[in-house]
Amino acid sequence: MRIVFLIFLSLFFTSYSYSSELNLFTSRHYPSDLILFKKFEEKTGIKVNVINAKSKVLEKRLLDEGSKSKGDVLFLADAGALYSAEEKKLFTKYNESQSLRLVPKSLKNDYWVGITKRARIIFYNPNLVDYNDIKNISYEDLSDERWTKSIAIRQSNNIYNQSLVASILEHRGENFTTKWLEKLVKNFSRKPQGNDRAQILSVAAGESKLAVANTYYYGLMLSGKKGDEQKKAAQKVKPIFPNQNDRGAHVNISGAGILKFSPNKKNAQSFIEFLLTKEAQTNLCNSSFEFPIIENVSTNKIINKIKNFKEDINIDVSTYGKRQAQAFKLMKKAGWN
């Protein structure tokens, strides 16, 4: 009887410990995320174990572990990365609770949901480019001869660039995109290199007239979190949102989904619902300078200055993943290193 009782206690405490944790696989690298995860722990009593790595590394680990995986939630930057994980059947469907219904349909599907937004836009040097000459610019205009040797942008293997080109493919078709890319690469001011902030620095220094970069990098630079030099550089450039006269600016997401073999699916669902509360959205966005995925969220003054623009909502962000391989192939063919 005593042995049976001890076995029961052992099973009880093992079960209790198991159900009171969450194993989060994330490619996001913001210290502020960890602070938010602590708040979730305090509110729910669910311990969050964070496994941080690049999306492809996380994807490979989950595939290698298969049904033995203890991963509960996969939280990744870029819809293309989420689509890749979905294609490999790493997710299970979530329950669409009230909070998840607040996310626009174009920013989620049955397996993952957008948590934050960012726009990939153009930054210009006002000492080199007149606002009136650029105020109505589109992504398509970046291939114009007037921008020869003027544009700073990252390499073709960058997923943000691949998603942008994927959106052009979806809107304009392969023939147009192929010709557009051939002209675009002639307008690069230098060999593509560095991160998004490096592109903005190039414009601030006068090396380039235009840069293509994500909005939150600009916010980070303006905030001073990346040092005084980068803050001063960001103050020298101006943001411009393309395609405001037609479809709107290209928008992408960070998003999360519940993993197929999650041992803690209820905790995983609760965690995703928590990320979509106004409190969590405020903390996420005011720290990372991304845009909230839901409405009526209080944001800081840096975000407030750039958050009112027309978004491209006529395209499902999952399309970026579907088109990325094709986009990358065309980018390389055009000579985009």
What name fits each language-model region?
Residues S254-N314:
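Mature extracytoplasmic/periplasmic domains
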Residues N23, I121-F123, G255-G257:
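Residues embedded in well-ordered beta-strands
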Residues V4-T14:
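Bacterial N-terminal signal peptides
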Residues R101, R118, L181-V185, R190-Q193, ...:
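Periplasmic-binding protein-like
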Residues S27, P31, K70-E207, M221-L222:
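Extracytoplasmic ligand-binding site segments that recognize negatively charged/polar headgroups
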Residues S15-S19:
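Sec/Tat signal peptide C-region and signal peptidase I cleavage site
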Residues S20-S84, N337:
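Early extracytoplasmic/lumenal segment of secretory-pathway proteins
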Residues T299-N337:
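Extracellular/periplasmic bilobal clamshell ligand-binding domains
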